[in-house]
Amino acid sequence: MDALFRFKHFSVRNTDSALKVGTDAVLLGTVMSIPGHCSRALDIGTGTGVIALIAAQRTEDFREPCHITGIDIDSASAQEAASNFALSPWSDRLQAQCVPLQEFSPGMEFDHIFSNPPYYDRSLRSSELRVSRARHSDTLDFDSLLSHSRSLLAPQGILSLIIPCEIVSDLRRRAASYGLYPFRLVKIRTTDRKFPKRAVVEFSTERVELDTEELTMTRDGVWTPEYSHYVDDFYLKKT
């Protein structure tokens, strides 16, 4: 089996990280907003580093360079992300650290924070502890994620997350208690025959009207134009 997940402009080694490259990560990386003024970004739970790499590609034409830090609690994941970063065209703007968010003290604020967070709460555990820690919210619950993200955000910064649709309302309620308010919600369905199961939700520190969208990935087995708009610059070929 090929150990590399190949994109158009970079490849991701996918062997040591606790969680592998998946649809959720690519969706977040391609769908999330990236502020045009973004000079510092933080990827929480970076895994293989794929979301940070997508963000690096999306910001390569920014007037000011956007430096992206990926952190992960799992040492093998952080090491693999660092290797993937080093082999990418944007190695000078990417770094990985093995550190829990709760202990991360960078001495700076970030214009953009993004995460594909663990959201399984006390559900069936994987037999491998590393995978279980990456998938379950015990080691990084939403309150910790929101409170630490809020403290690390620059005044005009944004937080982008991908989560199951059924927990969006609860997350919005929790976020408000930390002074974070949603400005964009993208509900995502895999096909036009299914209900949305994932959502990209984005927060800022300002109360604004919520922009709600729906994204359908495929129709009759073919990528929809709106999905292609997001992923064409990244995937090698359509599936």
Put a short name on every predicted segment.
Residues 17, 21, 139-196:
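Conserved Class I SAM-dependent methyltransferase catalytic core
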Residues 195-239:
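SAM/dcSAM-binding transferase cores
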Residues 2-40, 46-58, 202, 216:
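SAM-dependent Rossmann-like transferase core, predominantly class I methyltransferases
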Residues 117-144:
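Mobile active-site "lid"/loop adjacent to the S-adenosyl-L-methionine
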Residues 30-115, 121-127:
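Conserved SAM/SAH cofactor-binding pocket of Class I
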